[in-house]
């Protein structure tokens, strides 16, 4: 536990008999033994260090000050952060509007992100990786950099570890994702079911601004989900772990927001993506083993080019460790026949049996078996269809584990153990919502099936509402969310000449939304007003304002790219901004994206 002190010249972080001192003027960090008596472990001034981040003019120390227990797994307490304190080094915040805007981006990211940590367990690594790497290096250096969300913010402190290994005690890797656990008793044995989803910080971002791969083979919306099952009684305890992954279709493609419900699809050829896709799968195979690839995108309409692109990439790679399976989710499960996901399970069952899962003798901390391979699932967003399929795979794995333990019979389903089945459904549904919130801004679709096992009309209506929310958020709000990701993860580093607030679009573009709003207000005021004391007859005014609404909407949709809330720190690779005599306009970068070319 770390104690925090501050004065005008220094920050001090104390832990037992050592201390980190940060000079507020220079930002220099130093380590020294603490000559004072070990600090009392008071909850009032105890903090958890997230790190420090430099904005335009000043640097900021970020401390987690409020937390709650999220889960307890294998005796390790896991916490979720509820409040961060962001403290300026030199108090320059009020001197610059751009600094304030960046500060607000930082604060909003910290407020909305589901951050988890443990003082005693490295959450960035799966149980299998933790057992494999045990004792090889210090915990910080052993952490999985893909999921170490505050690694960039912790850099000043990590750099000191070489000279002072004790500094690692102050650094707490945090993951961005979802963690929960719950227990029940079945046949006199305690069964604990836990779920951990780790979101990768590589190519992190929002739904339409991060798709596909980058040049280094990092996919958008990559998440590792680990299902941990602990079965214990008075004599023994055994732990099972099973890992699945999800990630965007590994190629160069994007959906470009243009105010339409289905954005413009752009994609490069498979030959251009082959090198990056090879990097991606080579890394995945080295970490997880053979890849059972489950592709859930539609085989017709808007999504067809991406299905074809993915299959062309797989053919070009021709890797015997990649096992490709296509499942037309919407066709097979149409008319709410979602039980037909079993068709996919039957198809991949031999590979699931071959890859197995990790088994750990908890009392002896000895690995009895390892998972060899992983199922990598995707749909377009890697959210809704992917959630359903991953939960079905998780159910299949858990059922087999319980049969192995003798909890249920060889032919009995998980639903025969009602308390455990309820836990399973709820944690997988909550997991779906958290992953979806981080990427799309809303909860997941189709969670009524995950939570109850059936598709309902109420669930379909909730999906409609969430789809409408996604449209609004993804078109008009996600730019700032993407900026926050890029700022916190170090993808963009502002300097003293940075300008954030400038809107240099043509005057017409900036005025049309206000004209539309004025016409809407005047139209409804006239429609519902009982007074006729206007310059024009109400009927004429209604016609004119209605025509103004139609003309404004037509203009907006005809120039849709100009009205999107684009990121201001780093534009997506498929977009560029050009300066014209009228102002700055956004255009699709055709050198990087050619429509429907696969």
UniProtKB/Swiss-Prot annotation:
Every SAC domain range: 106-441
Listed transmembrane segments: 508-528, 535-555
Report a single Gene Ontology molecular function: phosphatidylinositol-4-phosphate phosphatase activity
Keyword Calcium in record: no
Q: For this protein, what is the EC number? A: 3.1.3.-
Q: Which parts of the sequence carry Phosphoserine?
A: 46
The compartments listed are: Endoplasmic reticulum membrane
The name of this protein is Uncharacterized protein C19F5.03
Q: What organism, scientifically named, is this protein from?
A: Schizosaccharomyces pombe (strain 972 / ATCC 24843)
């Amino acid at each position: 536990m770390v104690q925090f002190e501050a004065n005008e010249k220094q920050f001090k972080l104390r832990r037992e008999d050592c201390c980190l001192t940060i000079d507020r003027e220079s930002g220099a960090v130093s380590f020294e033994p603490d000559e004072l008596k070990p600090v009392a472990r008071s909850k009032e001034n105890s903090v958890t260090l997230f790190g420090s981040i430099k904005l335009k003019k000043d640097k900021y120390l970020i401390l987690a000050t409020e937390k709650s227990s999220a889960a307890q797994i294998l005796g390790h307490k896991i916490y979720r952060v509820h409040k961060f304190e962001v403290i300026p080094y030199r108090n320059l915040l009020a001197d610059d509007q751009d600094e304030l805007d960046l500060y607000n981006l930082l604060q909003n990211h910290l407020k909305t992100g589901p951050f988890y940590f443990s003082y005693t367990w490295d959450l960035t690594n799966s149980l299998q990786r933790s057992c494999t790497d045990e004792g090889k290096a210090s915990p910080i250096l052993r952490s999985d950099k893909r999921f170490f969300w505050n690694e960039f913010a912790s850099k000043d402190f990590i750099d000191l570890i070489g000279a002072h290994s004790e500094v690692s005690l102050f650094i707490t890797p945090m993951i961005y994702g979802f963690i929960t656990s719950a227990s029940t008793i079945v046949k006199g044995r305690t069964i604990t079911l836990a779920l951990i989803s780790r979101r990768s910080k590589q190519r992190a971002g929002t739904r339409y601004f991060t798709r596909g791969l980058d040049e280094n083979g990092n996919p958008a919306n990559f998440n590792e989900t680990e299902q941990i099952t602990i079965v214990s009684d008075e004599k023994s305890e055994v732990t099972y772990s099973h890992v699945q992954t999800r990630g965007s279709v590994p190629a160069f493609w994007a959906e470009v927001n243009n105010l339409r419900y289905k954005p413009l699809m752009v994609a490069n050829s498979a030959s251009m993506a082959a090198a990056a896709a090879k990097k991606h799968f080579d890394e995945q195979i080295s970490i997880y083993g053979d890849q059972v690839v489950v592709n859930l995108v539609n085989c017709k309409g808007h999504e067809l080019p991406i299905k074809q692109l993915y299959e062309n990439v797989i053919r070009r790679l021709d890797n015997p460790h990649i096992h490709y399976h296509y499942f037309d989710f919407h066709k097979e499960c149409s008319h709410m026949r979602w039980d037909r996901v079993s068709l996919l399970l039957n198809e991949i069952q031999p590979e699931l049996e071959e890859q197995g899962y990790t088994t750990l003798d908890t009392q002896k901390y000895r690995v009895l078996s390892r998972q060899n391979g992983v199922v990598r699932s995707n749909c377009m967003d890697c959210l809704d269809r992917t959630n359903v399929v991953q939960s079905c795979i998780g159910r299949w794995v858990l059922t087999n584990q319980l049969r192995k333990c003798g909890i249920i019979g060889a032919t009995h389903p998980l639903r025969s153990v009602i308390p455990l089945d309820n836990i399973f459904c709820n944690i997988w549904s909550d997991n779906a919502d958290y992953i979806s919130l981080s990427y799309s801004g809303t909860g997941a679709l189709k969670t009524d099936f995950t939570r109850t096992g059936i598709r309902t009309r109420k669930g379909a209506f909730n999906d409609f509402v969430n789809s409408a929310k996604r449209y609004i958020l993804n078109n008009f709000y996600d730019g700032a969310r993407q900026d926050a990701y890029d700022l916190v993860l170090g993808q963009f580093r502002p300097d003293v000449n940075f300008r954030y607030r400038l809107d240099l679009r043509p005057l017409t573009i900036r005025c049309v939304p206000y004209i539309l709003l004025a016409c809407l207000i005047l139209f409804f005021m006239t429609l519902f007003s009982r007074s006729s004391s206007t310059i024009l007859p109400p009927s004429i005014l209604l016609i004119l304002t209605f025509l103004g609404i139609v003309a404004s909407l037509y203009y907006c949709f005809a120039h849709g790219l100009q009205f999107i809330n684009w990121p201001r720190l780093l534009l997506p690779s498929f977009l560029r901004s050009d300066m014209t005599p009228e102002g700055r306009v956004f255009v699709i970068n055709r050198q990087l994206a050619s429509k429907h070319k696969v």
